[in-house]
Amino acid sequence: REEPPACTAACPLHLDMRQACALAAQGNFSRAAGILRKTTPFLHLLAGCCNAPCEKSCVMENLGDGVSMQVIEKACALYGGSGAMNRFMIPKKKKIVALAGEDLFCLGCCWELGKKGYEIHWYTGEKTPQEILTDWGLSKEEAAADLGSLEGFRIKKFPIQSGDGSFRDTCMQEADVLCVSPAFRGETLPETCFVGKGYQEVSWILADAKYVALKADRYLQGADFEDVSEPKTDKSRLFVTMDGVTGSKAVAGVETVTKETAQEEAARCIQCQCLECVKGCVYLQEYKRNPRGAIREIYNNMSIVMGNHMANKMINSCDECGQCKAACPNGFDYPEVCRIARQVMVETEKMPPSAHEFALLDQEFSNREGFLARTQPGYESSAYLFFPGCQAAAVSPETVEKAYKNLSGRLKGGVGLMLGCCGAISDWAGREDLFTSALEKIQREWEKQGKPQVICACPTCRKVLQEHTDLEPKGIWEVLLQLGVERVASGTASIQDACGARQDAQARAQVRKFVEALGCQVQELPMAQELAPCCGYGGLMPYANRELSLKKAAFAAGQSQGRILTYCMACRDQLSKAGADTCHILELAYGVEPPGVPDLSGRRANRLKLKEKLLREIWKEEIPMEEKLEIIYAPGVEAQLDDRMILKSDVQAVLKAYEETQAAAEDEEHGYLITNCRIGNVTFWVKFTVSEKGYVVHGAYSHRMTVE
């Protein structure tokens, strides 16, 4: 995105014609002229004498006429005001630059060195500066206008004749460096001398003057002047889509420029920029960043030793979905930068644990209390192992149950079951240690069951296990297609592609075949396949930036007014929150009515209930139930808990601690008791009253301070 447009890249002076056109299109020729005069003041000269490589390279040239940059330059020269600099604003430098010659190159050097504050001793012939410009075809009025920019500079003129070498000794006695016109290239010159290249085109001559003046300036500052880049043009690497752009003809020529025609011509500029990654990414839109600029900010944030890390939230808010990489013509992998940044900042203790602690505790719960690994009853090992993932068990446990029973009844050799988390949560959080631990646990259980074929119901789980383990998992949609799918639906439906399948075209194709086999006709969304937007769950966005997560969900849901099918349960959950008519393809296949959107406490409860039910009904095992307090929640409190990421189990723990200590403060105004308990790194406070039916909770909040 930060690459120069084609017109700038093709110009030896690298004039910012894109910005000039934007301002001229608004009728603001004064500011447009100011943009151009930052590079060169000779606007009449460019408008009349430049061969305009910018126009030939303009992308509009492919559809009609390129934007006439010379018209814009002429209008800026005519209506952009004087280019004279305030001489009081130019800091004076003590050193003197000698300049020899009587051509356009010397005028360019006068401008470049004069604006830097140097005193210039110009050894020239009989030609006046005005005559130098009129020799290029400018009128006296135009020449005077262009030369107005040199007013206020400290320029002293001395006579010289070409071929007379005596000036060298004279000028070098007074000056600190010598800049010489290409006309003197054949003469013997001192080492402290910089000579022009001898270009013929106007833009190249002025670019050469800029190059020589910069070398002289660096020499006078004692800096390395050998690495100064020579004038050059290049082909722009900026990707510009022409979708929806229609060609047009130039409005007017340079000879007939008016404010109106110039404004109309400038409006033909399409303001070339690459926004491919931003189009479908609410995150980049929200933070108003392009990936390169964001990476600079991330680098600076990581480099801070003492002080506030202001970009932490931006780093943690990326969903790491890979859409921007897929959309980028150059495959720029911004999500990987965010992932590495999180990991490094966690390792160096620059990332506070509060950002992702709740999600990491949820992973710990899935792989501890909610974990289950069993072979099918009657089998000591498994030919297959069903791994539905933590989100499916949390959002739609009935679907997991029906899917397992269906697979175990149709596949031979025994189908094992593993309930747990693949570790993607800890990978997103930058916790490589927890990620490795989760993968090792899965690997061990897989080996215990005889290294069966793993069947995943979650595309992210499948991607993680495929990339980081030896399991070689298959998607459940692929297995069911091979077994045969019953036609249970009709009509059209769109598919929200999962981020976990963004790089897996085969999986996306299989899902579409599966949906068609169910009886639905697939209607592709505007942004689908590898360019599908994230639902807003990836990268733990709901925990780091809930508001942005909801915006992403709304953006994804807004792609269709009809039914949207998902093959990721997190997508189904997020789209449901956004009000979309949506269900998971397995819910559709097994006739499960989508159960709505469970809150954070409900998600954990669903995992436990599923585990208990399967153990009881399939493996005939009973789990001792933990005795719970009778708690009634006042209206609105459950929503408050979910919004503040406080679990009902946390409330249970606080009230159990109260029963042991009887420590509470009384809110006399409302008649509440307020008690607290520290669980892990968080102190929870609960407002409650006691009734005949149990505790009535009227509110809760938390913080990370320790109360002593």
Where is each model-derived feature located?
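Cofactor-cradling patches in redox/metallo enzymes
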Residues: 134-141, 391-477, 500-519, 523-616
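Mid-to-C-terminal Rossmann-like scaffold of FAD/NAD(P)H-dependent oxidoreductases
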Residues: 221-268
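Short, structured interface segments
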Residues: 57, 67-82, 175, 212-225, ...
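Iron-sulfur-cluster electron-transfer modules
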Residues: 5-7, 18-170, 288-471, 608-617
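Ribonuclease/tRNase effector modules and their secretory precursors
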Residues: 604-605, 609-708
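Short hydrophobic core segments
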Residues: 174-183
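Flavin (primarily FAD) binding-site architecture
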Residues: 184-189
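A conserved FAD-binding loop/helix module that cradles the flavin
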Residues: 195-223
